[in-house]
Amino acid sequence: MATFDMRNKRAEAGTIASVATQAFDVVVIGGGPAGMAAALAAHKAGARVAIVEREQHLGGILRQCIHPGFGLSHFKQELTGPEYAQRFIDQVHATDIALFLGSMVLGIDSGEPAEDTEVHTVTLMNPAGMLQLTGRAVVLAMGCRERTRSEIKIPGSRPAGVFTAGLAQRYINIENLKPGSRTVILGSGDIGLIMARRCTLEGISVEGVYELMPYANGLRRNVKNCLDDFGIPLHLSTTVTRVIGHDRVEAVEVSQVDEHLAPIPGTERIVPCDTLLLSVGLIPENELSVAAGVELDPHTRGAVVDQSLQTGVPGIFACGNVLHVHDLADNVTTESERAGAAAAAYALGNGADDEVGAAGTGCELTVSPAGIAGYALPGRITTVGLTKLNFRVRRPVDAARVRILAGDEELFAGKVRPFKPSVMESFPLPAKVIQHALDLGVSEIVLSVDPVEEA
């Protein structure tokens, strides 16, 4: 098992107590897989980099993800979450990247322009007191949080025994605590599926996984490996409609739902259990982003960014799950390396016209989703060049085509193939397509995923 040795890199209280401000080129907020990848890429580009992390260790959520499945793309081998994280921790330790651990960021404020760029001040608090870090660029890599019971408004009493799936995962894998002995899982997201298997391995009886939608929301491999292989039932178009219990959960009421996702009267049944785990969605942690003036995309609840992952606030970049929820840590790493390299280019004034959208380039296109596309990212294109587009569909479809539209004109059409909401899709948008849109005089291009009726 990988270990987390922070002896040489931790920002000790005694070393920063007398320092009010420290200057860097790039300040990365978040020490998980996104933050570490961004920091390493920025450092490789020659920037002076700092990572601010609220926990006492680097690694983020991967520290509690002890299951395999990481690294297949990035390292070409299968690793557990801690093993995957440790590889980046070791790389960070081998550099002079400054670490501020156990430090909570209070805010990000833009300063006066200096040498044609904005200087940002990141104010943080740790056991030594308040400290300010300045940077020409800031990378937001705070990750995401789980949606709670109160956010989905499950009726019933409020007994002990209701957990988010991620919290239960931490209890079992980090704290060595057993959250219950008989559980129901609401939601078939990947964390819920993984916890169904983990609970079973720990001797906790899983009464079933209940999913509101008529399809599983997790990756197909997780449905097979975590449910099918362990004989755990998956109940689609079914939800929890009441929590029963006084001091502790005693049972939950589940009901089938109709095509409008409303409970169907007469389908209620009681499932005895002492624990309810919720895997009902992830929300990017963007309170800091909003306070810094960053515009959020209503579809992703992450920042609106351009092709370099720069937000609408010059010098502030975003990557990983704080930008949009990913399926795989490997994809987070790849995206975050792009953000870190772009942040360094911005901070150092290197290659701004190529990598980071600059004023005067004459390119300003917004990208909007249509059809069954749930979102399109980036939301803005500010340079003419090969651009990677990410999107996710809102419902599964056996046959659909991706189309890029500018007004009434179709600029690009992909092959007909199936799409699933559980899989984040991406494809390269050629520079000639972007230039064509500009030649048409439009200010918006549309990424549309349109179902195709098979003959």
Model-identified regions with their sequence ranges:
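A Rossmann-like FAD-binding core segment of flavoenzymes
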Residues: 87-124, 200-287, 385-418
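Beta1-alpha1 glycine-rich phosphate/pyrophosphate-binding loop at the start
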Residues: 24-87, 91, 179-223
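A conserved FAD-binding loop/helix module that cradles the flavin
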Residues: 319-367
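Surface beta-strand/loop "capping" patches
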Residues: 352-397
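Extreme N-terminal leader/targeting segments of oxidoreductases
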Residues: 1-25, 426
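FAD-site-proximal beta/loop scaffold in flavoenzymes
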Residues: 14, 140, 162-172, 275-326
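Core beta-strand elements of the Rossmann-like FAD/NAD(P) dinucleotide-binding domain
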Residues: 22-24, 128-137, 264-274
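Glycine-rich dinucleotide-binding loop and its adjacent helix/turn
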Residues: 8-10, 14-16, 144-184, 188-193, ...
